Swiss-Prot record:
One Pfam family here: Aminotran_3
Name assigned to this protein: Glutamate-1-semialdehyde 2,1-aminomutase
PTM annotation (N6-(pyridoxal phosphate)lysine): residues: 281
Catalytic reaction list: (S)-4-amino-5-oxopentanoate = 5-aminolevulinate
Protein family per UniProt: Belongs to the class-III pyridoxal-phosphate-dependent aminotransferase family. HemL subfamily.
Length: 443
């Protein structure tokens, strides 16, 4: 019996005998673009999105029963893989405890205490329902704490879809920004400054003119939403030093990197303590979650302790809290991080050799811990989005569809990173490379 196969007729009868093409056409009639997050539409790579029915370990199964080895992993939350047996048991227990309280409960307390005890800059923690919500709330705290209005962000870092941060660098004066989406008013982005990554001089210039007005500098210390743009530690140290010189709070967005690159995230690896930090993905064990954390005096500004209002009906829901707690405990107990790092290097080294043997361009893998990004080889590291090679999107799309056809699922965009999980053991990796070797013969 296929352990991925759903057993409920209420679920399976809906799509029984249907194809992904058929369901996608139906979906487009009732949902924008047929999906509920744009990248899922395959717009970046072309073709029809695969409709998946179930998942287990490192494997996805589509509605036709075809299996794929998954290197997207829901864009990062599933560090243990799909339905890890221990986490699955916790979730099953939770269905018999409560689905939602909307009240005080012990499960969020235990998870918050674990995070706070292991992450020294997270003196207090507030759980929310998404990374976007976490960032929105953290910046509200920063504005309240400083009495300032402006936020400084960096081109190539993604912080969710809130209006004030869905912006890109504009032309003209340093820091000027322009909307990255329709429907965002000019007033929403008037207080957002945007600079290129890897440019300390630009940061210093903006602070010289705007420093007294900037409430927070926000950055992904490991930018992983527009490729994997690994930053120099010297750059990060310098911008943090500059921000603090002007009384600006430092916010690290670790929604992707938190508990992925190590238990203390990039902040721990770098030895740089932010004033506020946002987490998500892994801390929910695969369920919707986000949190913002930081110094006690800053978090005590949040209601009901202080004047900064933030609330949520399903915040700290028991599924996310218990699954997240179990995930973090297992990650600690089994010391998964160094093993995942080694597996990722083995996987990407061999995959790069296969790509270079079969392709008309030279590829390389950019890796950090268990994150990876395949792109055209360049002479210098790529730390800014304007340096991503031309034609990358098209080159990746060809690789994506070659792998997809043969049962390897990558994130459906050349600008999304890939992930390994604890379920990607030596056998799964070897199987992936064997499939890739055969698939690339027709590349």
């Amino acid at each position: 019996m296929n352990q991925n196969k759903p057993t409920s007729k209420l679920i399976s009868d809906f799509w029984k005998g249907k194809t992904s093409e058929e369901l996608f056409e139906r979906a487009k009639k009732v949902s924008p673009g047929g999906v509920h997050s744009p990248v899922r539409s395959f717009r970046s790579v072309g073709g029809t999105p695969v409709f998946f029915a179930s998942a287990k370990g490192a494997t996805l199964t589509d509605i036709s029963g075809k299996e794929y080895i998954d290197y997207c992993l829901s864009f990062g939350p599933l560090i243990l893989g799909h339905r890890d047996p221990e986490i699955e048991e916790v979730v099953r227990e939770t269905t018999e405890i409560a689905w939602s309280f909307g009240a005080a409960e012990p499960y969020s307390l235990e998870l918050a205490e674990l995070i706070s005890s292991r992450v020294p800059w997270a003196e207090k923690v507030r759980f929310v329902n998404s990374g976007t919500e976490a960032v929105m709330s953290a910046l509200r705290v920063a504005r309240a704490a400083t009495g300032r209005e402006k936020i400084l962000k960096f081109d190539g870092c993604y912080h969710g879809h809130l209006d004030s941060l869905l912006v890109k660098a504009g032309s003209g004066l340093a820091g000027e920004s322009s909307s990255d989406s329709a429907g965002i008013s000019a007033t929403s982005i008037a207080n957002t400054l945007v600079l290129p990554l890897d440019d300390e001089a630009s940061v210093e210039r903006v602070f010289e003119t705007e420093g007294k007005n900037i409430a927070a500098l926000i950055i992904e210390p490991l930018p992983a939403n527009y490729g994997l743009l690994i930053q120099r530690k010297e750059f990060l140290l310098k911008i943090v030093e500059t921000a603090r010189k002007y009384g600006t709070l430092v916010v690290f967005d670790e929604v992707i990197s938190g508990f992925r690159v190590g238990f203390q995230g990039m902040s721990g690896l770098l030895g740089i303590w932010p004033d506020l930090v946002t987490y998500g993905k892994i801390i929910g064990g695969g369920f919707p979650v986000g949190c913002y954390a930081g110094k006690k005096d800053l978090l005590d500004l949040v209601a009901p302790s202080g004047p900064v209002y933030q609330a949520g009906t399903l915040s700290a829901n028991p599924f996310g809290m218990r699954a997240g707690l179990a995930t973090l405990k297992k990650a600690q107990r089994d010391s998964i991080y160094s093993v995942l790092d080694d597996r990722t290097k083995i996987f990407t080294d061999t995959m790069t050799k296969l790509l270079n043997k079969k392709s008309n361009q030279e590829w390389e893998a950019v890796i950090h811990s268990s994150l990876f990004w395949f792109r055209k080889k360049t002479q210098q590291p790529i730390r800014r989005i304007d340096l991503i090679p031309e034609g990358h999107k098209e080159s990746f799309a060809k690789v994506f569809h070659t792998f997809l056809k043969n049962g390897i699922y990558l994130a459906p965009s050349g600008y999304e990173v890939g992930f390994l999980s604890w379920a990607h053991d030596d056998e799964i990796i070897a199987k992936t490379l064997e499939i890739a070797d055969k698939a690339l013969k027709t590349f």
